Each structure stands twice: as C-alpha cells, then as structure tokens.
C-alpha cells in the first residue's frame, strides 16, 4: 500500500456527522470501519466520535486500514494564536500517533455552516487585516504540523471566509507554499462557483489532499431557490458520492494523474444515513472508481 501513488479513502461523514451528532448516532466505529473494508477502501479520516489513538490503532490494525487526516477548526482571526497553537499541537500529536499524513485546517471565524443562514448568499467576508492574521497564522500552524511529520492542507468550504476561487487564490498567494498546502474539494467549489476544474488546474502544485464529493444539481437548484442553510442542504441530498451526481470525475482524475498527484483521494459525501444507506453508497462509489477511473494496471496494484 505504501508504494502506491494514490490511496483511496472514504470519510466517516456518510455514517455519522460531527455537525449534527444525532445523525447516524447508532453507527459505531466498528460498523464504520468494517463497512470501509467491505467497500474496499484503504482508509478514512478521523471523525469526532473516534476514540483515543491506542484504541483506534487496534481497530485499524485488525482491518489493515489507515488514517489520512482529520479536520481542525481554526479560529486564528477570533482567538489569540497561543490558544489555537495549543489545540493544534494536541491535534497533530494525535494524528502522528495514528499514522496520518495531513492536518486538514479550516478557518471557522464567522462561519455559517452550522447556522440557519442561507449558505448560498450569506457567507462571511474577511477584512484585509483579518486576511493578514489568517495567512500569518496558517504559516505558523504549518510549521507546527511539520514538527509531527504532517502536511497542513487548507479546506476551502461553503459558508466560510475561504470558499470561492478568488478567496483560495488570495490564501495561496499570501501563504508559504512550503508550509501551507491545499485540500481540493470538488463538491464545495462546484456549489460555490459552478465550476470545479479551474481551481484544480490553477493550484495543482499546492494540492496535497483531495475530497471527491459529487453534487445533485436538481437538489442544489431547489436548495438555492429556497435559501437553505448548509445543514438543510446536505440533509436534503445536495451532496452524494462520485458517479451519482453531475461532476465528471474522469476529467478531475486525469488531471491529477497527469500531474503525478501523490496522496489520498477521499470520498466525502455528507448525507442523511437514514435516507442514503452508508454501505450502499460506499459500494456505489467504489464501483464508479473501479469502472470509470482506475486503469487496468491500477486495478492490478489493488489486488
């Protein structure tokens, strides 16, 4: 597994959701990890309900699974750097212990992703001084991540101050490329900008982690028309797994391969598990990846 250029994972968000803890609350860690094995993925990202590192490592070892990384909500604009740094050190120490490769960071100051606000029209905007604070802080967090053998990857996200291509551009232009890399999420940039290729091609050199998230365009249109919140939109089924929506992942994957991308591609599709059976959708994603994306040689490597 370690010799493969690309590792395929699937995020726990299809089973349980940290933003709405009651969603899928009956899905245990053992259930999640065993489903991932059945669907033939190589690993996952850490969810909020995951246990201590020793317990998690035992469960992973039993199933030959790996951890890619974990989300970290930064408040560099709102909070003193010392408090953010302390939390991030603990976050990275845990990730190092479970063998992760990336620390996924998203600035949550002013975020509306957990509020009832219209996710499509009411996103926050940072001032020039706030941008400076954010970028300087991210550079410092990047140094911390490296102390633990991790790469900091920034997650552009709906409902935050770094959502659009223009905002990602500004973040990339004002952070050190040796310290701050990019997580490319197909679904978030498509919902934000109605395009998913430009961000990919423009920032290929900074992309060190990838989320494959598909979008149901009909449900997206309804959610936009109704002015839904982020939580309402994903519960309505705006997001789904690759092959079940409107994004052409063959184009995305071809660009990544051409650029010799190395790292994780994680299927991440937050849905209501009561409506979208997690294992069923994991298997759908696996089938799409096998039939539409992987070459014969890549398939042989996986056997």
Curated annotation (Swiss-Prot):
EC number: 4.2.1.44
Catalytic activity entry: scyllo-inosose = 3D-3,5/4-trihydroxycyclohexane-1,2-dione + H2O
Natural source organism: Halalkalibacterium halodurans (strain ATCC BAA-125 / DSM 18197 / FERM 7344 / JCM 9153 / C-125) (Bacillus halodurans)
GO molecular function: manganese ion binding; myo-inosose-2 dehydratase activity
Gene: iolE
Protein name in the entry: Inosose dehydratase
Entries under SUPFAM superfamilies matching the protein: Xylose isomerase-like (SSF51658)
Keyword NAD appears in the UniProt entry: no
Origin: domain of life: Bacteria
